[in-house]
Amino acid sequence: MVQLDNIVKTYNKGKSNAFEALHGISLTIEDGEMVAIIGTSGAGKSTLLHILACIDGYDSGEYRIDDMTIGKISERKMAAIRNEKIGMVMQDFALIEEFTALDNVMIPLDFAARGKKKRKKDRKEIARKMLEMVQMQDFVDKPVS
């Protein structure tokens, strides 16, 4: 479960051009729940998503993933949380054109498996299932270009 309680984020804090991007944001996202963040340009959507993805910090409030309070843990533990619990697709993403669809999907799986005993065969099966979920199984072995 993901919980935000009264999150505040200010850019250029303490300066004359300070801007409060988020003020008092609270939300709960249950395991398995899908949520869409919508709003006008400049509404704070990207700021909120960067905080949720543990890419950026916040000024006050509390952010919890399961039982862990984010912001009160080490950078090493934060990296582990990003690796195990958080996924984010950027608005402007790029595929490696010379790679197949399967190879592109394998990149984050291979990265996450570094230092762990996860077999490549198992990761490939996960990647294949992911491609099936989005009805791209026919493109598994084709370059994405």
Region locations from a protein language model:
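ABC ATPase NBD coupling module
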Residues: 19, 70-87, 120
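Helix-to-loop junction immediately C-terminal to a conserved catalytic motif
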Residues: 53
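Conserved ABC ATPase "signature" region
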Residues: 68-69, 110, 118-139
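Signature (C-motif/LSGGQ) region and adjacent switch/coupling loops
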Residues: 18, 74, 102, 132, ...
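The feature captures the beta-strand-to-loop junction immediately N-terminal to the Walker
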Residues: 38-40
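Short coil-to-helix segment of the ABC ATPase nucleotide-binding domain corresponding to the Q-loop/switch region
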Residues: 99-108
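A short, flexible loop at the N-terminus of ABC-type nucleotide-binding domains that lies
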Residues: 1-4, 10-24
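Conserved ABC transporter NBD signature motif
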Residues: 61-69
